[in-house]
Swiss-Prot record:
A Pfam family annotated for this UniProt entry: PAX
Region entry PAI subdomain, spans: 37-93
InterPro entries per the UniProt record, alphabetical: HD (IPR001356), Homeobox_CS (IPR017970), Homeodomain-like_sf (IPR009057), PAIRED_DNA-bd_dom (IPR043182), Paired_dom (IPR001523), Pax7_C (IPR022106), PAX_fam (IPR043565), WH-like_DNA-bd_sf (IPR036388)
Name assigned to this protein: Paired box protein Pax-3
GO molecular function, one term: transcription coregulator binding
Lineage: Eukaryota, Metazoa, Chordata, Craniata, Vertebrata
Basic and acidic residues bias (residue ranges): 172-188
Protein family according to the UniProt entry: Belongs to the paired homeobox family.
Gene Ontology annotations for the cellular component aspect, listed alphabetically: nucleus; transcription regulator complex
Organism: Mus musculus (Mouse)
Length: 479
């Protein structure tokens, strides 16, 4: 949709009755000054551009009439931080211009008593200068340094009360003001007192563009002390809702004999205290459940079956079982992330399982593959079986249904294929073969680690059996 320069589309012009989203990026609207956005209060702002001057004047006017900054923020749809910053800067410098540093302070409104005193001094001594009247006001303790009028203000009062007179008198007043300015620059009174007027510029003076409205000095309010009845009433209302509306706050203020503003501030402080207590309670509950990290029962883990090559010294090799039907393939527990399944013949005794390097098949977290020896008399290693959970114990002692493979069909296939025919024997496997030469009770004369494998060694028996996977028993794939 194309629009003319300076025109605001009617459909995207923010109206007072629209509800704008409270989260996410603000809406974008077209304004005469450029592409604007809508804040959370529904007001339009342009990022990087200062607030318009008429809104700044309105903020100061509302604050002059005693309206609180939070109410000004909601009515003008300007953020609370922007309102507070403008009011604070105006109170310090007397300027509402964006980025103003320094400038003149707001003009002091002279009280009628001070004006009468100035007229009295002038009548008693018609030749008294304005700066002399100012010093006499301070000397007689009519005003203090914060409330004493400036030299220009005294001159303006004298001109309005006694008339302009002749041109010479006006020139004398101007020279007098200039002389007082020069004196004030080098005196302590001039440094601590207010300056006469701001310098003129091409854009106009600061006084002409500023809203010449005195603001009440923000005084520290003493903390409100609530009685037991008031606290009980407020706590009951807080149990019903943490965010009462204006009607609930006014009704509660009448019952508790408080102002609506005090009730609103109390609920804000009470919500902050409630959030702090809720966070502390959650932290205490978390520490109570997990005093030293994770609890032992929360994450059951299997014992690690890792045996170092140097510490394992086979002293005896169990005999092979004569009945091949009773031979069981006992699966080794794998890491949770491992999905590969390995099939190792069980008639090869436990020492033969160490002849395959684990790095060849990707088991980097296991130094060696452990397969318990098969046999009815020694179903598992008792030293390792003591640390197993009942589920794993039942899995290892479950005999049946797994076909027997001859020793020559030595295959391990964690991926899609098995060992390659050109696979060489590892150094650790050769060392163990040297240690096992003195054993007389080997099941067969076939070596445990042949240098090469024939292609016939990869055939599988077409007998239907079961393989133990990660999620229980499943029928193997038939080739």
């Amino acid at each position: 949709m194309t629009t003319l320069a300076g025109a605001v589309p009617r459909m995207m012009r923010p109206g007072p009755g629209q509800n704008y989203p409270r989260s996410g990026f603000p809406l974008e609207v077209s304004t005469p000054l450029g592409q604007g956005r809508v804040n959370q209060l529904g007001g339009v702002f342009i990022n990087g551009r200062p607030l318009p001057n008429h809104i700044r004047h309105k903020i100061v006017e509302m604050a002059h009439h005693g309206i609180r900054p939070c109410v000004i923020s909601r009515q003008l749809r300007v953020s609370h931080g922007c309102v507070s910053k403008i009011l604070c800067r105006y109170q310090e410098t007397g300027s509402i211009r964006p980025g103003a540093i320094g400038g003149s302070k707001p003009k002091q409104v002279t009280t009628p008593d001070v004006e009468k005193k100035i007229e009295e001094y002038k009548r008693e001594n018609p030749g008294m200068f304005s700066w002399e009247i100012r010093d006499k006001l301070l000397k007689d303790a009519v005003c203090d340094r914060n409330t004493v009028p400036s030299v220009s203000s005294i001159s303006r009062i004298l001109r309005s009360k006694f008339g302009k007179g002749e041109e010479e008198e006006a020139d004398l007043e101007r020279k007098e003001a200039e002389e007082s300015e020069k004196k004030a620059k080098h005196s302590i009174d001039g440094i601590l007192s207010e300056r006469a007027s701001a310098p003129q510029s091409d854009e106009g003076s600061d006084i002409d563009s500023e809203p010449d409205l005195p603001l009440k000095r923000k005084q520290r309010r003493s903390r409100t002390t609530f009685t037991a009845e008031q606290l009980e009433e407020l706590e009951r209302a807080f149990e019903r809702t943490h965010y009462p509306d204006i009607y609930t706050r006014e009704e509660l203020a009448q019952r508790a004999k408080l102002t609506e503003a005090r009730v609103q501030v109390w609920f804000s402080n009470r919500r902050a205290r409630w959030r702090k207590q809720a966070g502390a309670n959650q932290l205490m509950a978390f520490n109570h459940l997990i005093p030293g990290g994770f609890p032992p029962t929360a994450m059951p883990t299997l014992p690690t079956y890792q045996l170092s090559e140097t510490s394992y010294q086979p002293t005896s090799i169990p005999q092979a079982v004569s009945d091949p039907s009773s031979t069981v393939h006992r699966p080794q527990p794998l890491p949770p992330s491992t999905v590969h399944q390995s099939t190792i013949p069980s008639n090869a005794d436990s020492s033969s399982a160490y002849c395959l390097p684990s790095t060849r098949h990707g088991f980097s977290s296991y130094t060696d593959s452990f397969v318990p020896p098969s046999g009815p008399s020694n179903p598992m290693n008792p030293t390792i079986g003591n640390g197993l959970s009942p589920q794993v114990m039942g899995l290892l002692t479950n005999h049946g249904g797994v076909p027997h493979q001859p020793q020559t069909d030595y295959a391990l296939s964690p991926l899609t294929g098995g060992l390659e025919p050109t696979t060489t024997v590892s150094a650790s496997c050769s060392q163990r073969l040297e240690h096992m030469k003195n054993v007389d009770s080997l099941p067969t004369s076939q070596p445990y680690c042949p240098p090469t494998y024939s292609t016939a060694g990869y055939s599988m028996d077409p007998v239907t059996g079961y393989q133990y996977g990660q999620y229980g028993q499943s029928k193997p794939w038939t080739f």
